[in-house]
Amino acid sequence: PLKAMYINCKLKRVADTEYRLIAQIIKELGQEIPPTGLPTDEVYNIFYKLLDQQKQLILLVLDEIDQLTKKMGDDILYNLTRINTELKKAQLCLIGISNNLIFVENLDPRVKSSLSEEELIFPPYNALQIQDILKKRSERAFSPNVVQPGVIEKCSAYSARDHGDARRAIDLLR
């Protein structure tokens, strides 16, 4: 069996400390721990036991992973990449998502070697792709005839010209 978990590492009070990140993952696995107060080693022990109880492959997606290392350093990644040595009945697989293509270059060599990284680089969206995304989003978000003709096209063009970032286009549409 496979269980997928998603954590946005840019969110405050979710991934701004190692303790909070592990506590959030524990919460995603169905158990609550106090938001502060326990020694980090004890939080990790709870985490290990809980993972092993799952008896499955856990796919942990860390969005904005570069923000995680920027806030905490790369010790957290080192610990997460070595966790499978502690587990007997489960496995943890990490997927990191980042817009910063060079953040890996600044990691400690021990962390880099344990990542077993495989990079997938997605090119920026073009104006037509962004336009398609915005049309679908606007159909769900707005009542009919609220978005004036040409607005989606203009937002798409601006966003594609800047960086091809769909999030920026959605912000413009708002």
Which residue ranges define each predicted feature?
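Short beta-to-alpha linker loops that shape the active-site pocket of alpha/beta-hydrolase fold enzymes
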Residues: K10
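Mid-core helix/loop region of P-loop NTP-binding domains shared across ATPases and GTPases
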Residues: K3, R13-I133, A141-L173
